[in-house]
Amino acid sequence: NSRAKLLGLELQPWRANSDKAEYIVLCGQHDKSLQWQGMPPLGKWVSDTMKAIRKVTPRPIVWRAHPRAPLQYLETQYKDVIKEPPVKLQGTYDSYDQRFDALDWAVISYSSNMGPHAIIRGKPAFVGESSLAWDVGNDINNLENIENPIMPDREQWLNDYAWTEYTIEEISEGLPLNYLTTLL
């Protein structure tokens, strides 16, 4: 797992404070991205997902909109929904804080970076098939399992995931292109 270590990726234990965890974190994404192609309007998807969560659990929901798709006031339509605005990281062009709290029970993210980041930080994630967290996540279409999510071994997945990211130095040396051409 030297690749993951090189990138500073370290798995946190699965939900270490499970007796205190309570929040469902629902993450939006940029609805103009290719990852969202063929999906319903983002507002409808978020609304439908909140309704699906409410059918299976009374846990409070933390709504994290994507910075480029804020969906204003959506959280006011539902009980026990807290909007958490994106926090831009200083000194970056376009990076936002992707932290998770010890009180987070599970994360729902169709295919944004929040899915893999949740898995790395020990939070079960419910994701779509196009998510990089799919292999170790829970199926987003099975939210009825949100009270008992799977939490599989993640070591091999982390190693594989680490090969989807490259440092600036590696990019300048042409390593990603060299690696990709071996797959052709």
Please identify what each model-predicted range represents.
Residues L11-P13, S47-D48, Y93-S95:
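A generic local structural motif
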Residues D19-E75:
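Conserved catalytic-core segment of nucleotide-activated headgroup transferases in glycan assembly
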Residues K51-R54, R59, P67-R121:
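Donor nucleotide-activated moiety binding/catalytic core segment of transferases
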Residues Y93, S111-G115, A125-G137:
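Short glycine/proline-centered loop/turn elements that form peptide/ligand docking sites
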Residues N1-A21, D135-L184:
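Leloir-type glycosyltransferase catalytic cores
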Residues A4-E10, M114-P116, R121-G128:
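A structural signal for the main folded, soluble domain(s) of proteins
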Residues W36, D97, I119-R121, D135-L143:
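Short, charged, surface-exposed secondary-structure boundary motifs
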